[in-house]
Amino acid sequence: MAMQYIESELRRQGKENLADTIASVHKLNGSDIPFPSAATSIEKPVAQTPETPVAIKRFSRDQLILPETQIPQEVSDILQRAERAGIRLEPYHLSNVVLDENSSVEGWNSKPERWYWEQIGKGNIGQDAPKLSDSWVLVDPITRPDYKDGEQLHISDPLGPLLAKLRKEKKIKNLKGIPAASRFVISPNELIAVVLPEIAELLGVEASAVRLPKAIEFNVIGNMKHPEWGQANTWEWFEDNFEDDNRLAGGDSDNGGLADVDYGWSCGRYGGVAFRPLVVVSPKA
């Protein structure tokens, strides 16, 4: 019996948020699988023509991700521990820049969609969401797979054994039909409470140093370094909260790729939403 997932309904109805597509939980073979229902699509407001000229911030690409310089010792130590653990991380030095919808940056060709900026203006997404903090970030560069009925796996995933262990120990939900090593069908709440702290322990860093990428970090690094992050018809979770108990997600190639920003429940487990860890190393005072 085939499992039903939210993605199929999203593609039938057109783009809408992940959370509002789900009306209940499908009980299938003892598993808690979110399933789509006939939800009303969210209308995203049509852009209005500004009455006055908009000030455009102009940056070079090197003002967002600083050119490679000498890597701090703390960053090098984390990279070495990650390598010993079989985890690949890429270091990027982000600058202290606040972007907006009208910012002009060479290579920033697929900006977050209009809805993202509108929700920041409405206060549903934090005001600091489009800010790149002055810090080194070490990000997992793995490519998401395309959707295959929830059974898809990241190729040669170094986190697979850890995720299988956590499911076996019942620290994260083990759902029937979902591969034990899968990065999918894990809720943001489980990621924050269990998975990311376990990764921090593997890397020998404080739990607070490991988080999900913000939507703007995913977008900027994706544009500049990893366009393939927007070329799979799956999503990934972001660090940003939305409203009271939701979390941003995005990256779906069917809905704009790198520009795509959606949201889902923080407690939701979705067959097409994965994650990537990011380690933050802030400058020493």
Specify the residue positions occupied by each region the protein language model found.
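Short acidic catalytic loops
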Residues: 209-220
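Short acidic-hydrophobic catalytic motif
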Residues: 1-209, 223-285
